[in-house]
């Protein structure tokens, strides 16, 4: 009997250790910073992008917004289209403003401004990720700042985690700045937080069944949204997409193994939006693979022209 109890205790401890390690892996993703961009030979700050249309080097401003007593860093670039909207880019899990630079390259000719920020626990921002629970509040603060500084029309664009944050920020928001949001672009969105968590763990060869469920349950409890992530209000991004009062464009790769294309379709349909399915597209690389980058840019261009 003693041996059985000892083995059971050992199994319990081992399980809790795996769950704890999984929680840490999910809530503290690798930080994508200037050094990581340099190691891959990619731009690490806005000034390293291609020159402006007139041949002048790209310039930008650095500033921060306050969120939960934390300063979140922002890059603010001037675009080439004076009559275009300001576009605010919100990154995915494990990404940062560095990843936004790839998209900024395509957006600068279409926008009057391109604004990029690091969410908590990513890039150069302090803290740990909030997993999309309330980052929309920080994004709303950012929208207010952008509008107050001279941009009356704003497009929100995000990918993966940032796609859901963008949809949530623009939905059912009645403050004055909300009327300045003229469109939302969601790249590789997902409906529920557990979906990319399971798929990311699977891709990394880690336990992704009930271990992931337990880990996300503990994370939800810690973030105040409950074990099932709906203590205060549902997380489901489809629900918030249905509340949008502006056009929605969804870009989704059909080979996406992190955010299912079915989620993107459901979100687009809820908002009566436009879904661009990319047959060769995966979760990553839509803007660095030539075939998908061209399709994404054309959809982006047409959307910005439509809403500006």
What are these model-derived regions, one by one?
Residues 243-244, 250-252, 256:
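Short beta-strand/loop motif that positions the catalytic acidic residue
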Residues 257-263:
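Conserved alpha/beta-hydrolase "acid-adjacent" motif
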Residues 171, 175-230, 240:
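Hydrolase active-site cap/lid region
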Residues 281-294:
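Catalytic histidine-centered segment of alpha/beta-hydrolase-like enzymes
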Residues 107-126:
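Conserved alpha/beta-hydrolase
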Residues 158-166:
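Gly/Ala-rich beta-loop-alpha elbow adjacent to hydrolase catalytic centers
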């Amino acid at each position: 009997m003693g041996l059985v109890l000892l083995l059971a205790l050992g199994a319990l401890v081992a399980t809790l250790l795996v769950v704890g390690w999984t929680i840490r892996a999910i809530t503290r993703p690798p930080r994508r910073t200037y050094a990581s961009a340099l190691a891959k030979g990619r731009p690490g700050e806005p000034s390293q992008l291609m020159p402006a249309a007139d041949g002048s080097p790209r310039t930008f401003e650095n500033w921060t917004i306050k969120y939960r007593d934390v300063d979140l860093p922002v890059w603010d670039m001037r675009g080439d289209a004076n009559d275009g909207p300001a576009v605010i880019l919100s990154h995915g899990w494990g990404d940062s403003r560095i990843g936004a630079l790839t998209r900024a390259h395509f957006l600068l000719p279409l926008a009057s401004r391109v604004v990029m920020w690091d969410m908590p626990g990513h890039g150069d921002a302090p803290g740990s990720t909030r997993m999309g629970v309330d980052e929309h509040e920080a994004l709303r603060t950012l929208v207010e700042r952008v509008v107050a500084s001279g941009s009356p029309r704003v497009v929100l664009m995000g990918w993966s985690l940032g796609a859901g944050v963008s949809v949530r920020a623009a939905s059912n928001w009645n403050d004055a700045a909300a009327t300045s949001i003229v469109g939302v672009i969601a790249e590789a969105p997902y409906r529920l937080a557990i979906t990319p968590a399971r798929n990311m763990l699977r891709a990394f060869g880690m336990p992704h069944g009930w271990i992931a469920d337990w880990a996300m349950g503990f994370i939800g409890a810690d973030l105040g949204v409950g074990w099932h992530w709906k203590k205060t209000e549902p997380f489901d991004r489809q629900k918030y997409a249905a509340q949008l009062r502006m056009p929605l464009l969804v870009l989704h790769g059909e080979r996406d193994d992190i955010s299912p294309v079915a989620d993107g379709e459901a979100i687009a349909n809820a908002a009566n939006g436009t879904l661009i399915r990319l047959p060769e597209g995966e979760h990553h690389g839509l803007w660095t693979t030539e075939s998908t980058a061209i399709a994404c840019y054309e959809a982006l261009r047409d959307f910005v022209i439509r809403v500006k």
